[in-house]
Amino acid sequence: MKNSTSLRMWLLPMLLCALPAASAGAGELTRGGMLSASCAGCHGPNGRSPGAIPNISGKDAEFIRTALQEFRSGKRASTVMGRHAKGYTDEEFALIADYLASRK
């Protein structure tokens, strides 16, 4: 089970990289999708969690972006998200937030 989860965590970003972008906007969503692939390990595919972890797909982009910034700064309490958020820039937060907000 752990190996299949690890495989999915690496396979999805690689597949997303292989997708051609139809326009600049689509390219940004693809990059946002690639960046948000690590979210799927806890939040489920496309941000739809099957368990107790919050669903993040379809949330307002500004809400997601602010939450990520607050996790990174420590303003918002977390067990795991603070550590994950430290690895991303504000630009990457915006791409992730826009991608997840588009997953309605």
Where is each model-derived feature located?
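Soluble non-cytosolic domains of exported or imported proteins
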Residues: T30, G58, G87-E91
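Gly/Gly-Pro-rich "capping" loops immediately C-terminal to redox-active cysteine motifs
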Residues: N46-R76, G82, K86
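Electrostatic cytochrome c docking/interface patches
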Residues: C17-S36, A52-P54, R65, E70, ...
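C-terminal capping alpha-helices of c-type cytochrome domains
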Residues: S73-R76, K86-K104
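Detector for the c-type heme attachment site
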Residues: C42-S49, A101
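The canonical Cys-X-X-Cys-His
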Residues: A37-P45, I96
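Bacterial N-terminal signal peptides that target proteins for export
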Residues: K2-L11
